[in-house]
Amino acid sequence: MKEEIQMRNLKRALSLALASVMLLGMMVIGASAVSINDFTDQDEIVNKEAVALLVDLGIVNGKSDTNFGATDTLERTALAKMVYIALTGTDDASMYADMNVFSDVTAANCWAAGYINYCYSVDVLSGVGGDRFSPYSSLTVAQTAKALLVALGYIPDAEISMYEGNDWAINVMRDAQANRLLDGIGQSAHSPITRDNAARMIFNALKAEMVTPEYQYDMGTQYVTKYNGRGVTLGQSTFGLVSTSALVTGIDTNGNAVLD
C-alpha cells in the first residue's frame, strides 16, 4: 500500500515538474479518490497536466468516476464549485447553502447552492437577472475568465474595472491575456467554454499572482488607480503550490519528490 501511494505521488510530481509548472512542495493534499487515469475518455483531454492537477487537488471532478466530459460545455454550477475550492481549499460549502440568494437556487433544488451563494457573496459570480442564477446554463470563455480574475483580486464593478457594460468582455479578455489565463485555450470570448479548457484556465489561474487594488477618491467617488501584486499566486495561497522546472529523480520514504 505504501509503495502504491509513493508511486502515485511520484507520477503526480513528474507530471508537474517535467512540464515546468507546479509541484506540491509539502505533498499536503491527500490522494484523490479519482485520478485522470480513471477516466475512460482521457484521450479526449487535451490539457492533461491541468486536469491531472485539478483532479488531484479536488477542484475538478468528472461527470462520473469514469467520464471526465472534456468536450462538454461548463455549467455555472461546476464553475462555482471549482472557484470555491480554489479559493478555500475545501469542498464543504454547507454553511452557505441556506442563504437563499436566488429564487432558482436553494439547498433543496440545487446541489451547488452553497458554492453559488459563496461565489455571489465575494462577487465572483452574479445572477442572470430577475432574481435568477440559471445554475445549469453554460458559460462562455469570457464569463469564466471574469470569475477567475475576480478570484485573483480584480474588482468587477463597472466604474472600476469596466467588467460590466457593453465592453465588459473586451476588458475581461484584455486582463485575462495579461495574466496568462488564456494560455492554451484557443476559444473566442463568447464561445461556450469546454470542461477541458475550463480546467486549463483554472490551472493558469493557480499560477497567476493575486492582486490587491489601490484606491483613490475623486469628488467622493472611489476608483482603483492600479493593482499591486501580492507576491503570492492563487495556488500558493490556497494549496501551498510552488513553481519549479527541476527534474524529479525519485521519491523519498516520506512520499516527497526528490529534485535534481
What are these regions (language model features)?
Residues 51-60:
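Mature N-terminal segment immediately following signal peptide/propeptide cleavage
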Residues 119:
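Calponin-homology-like cytoskeleton-binding modules
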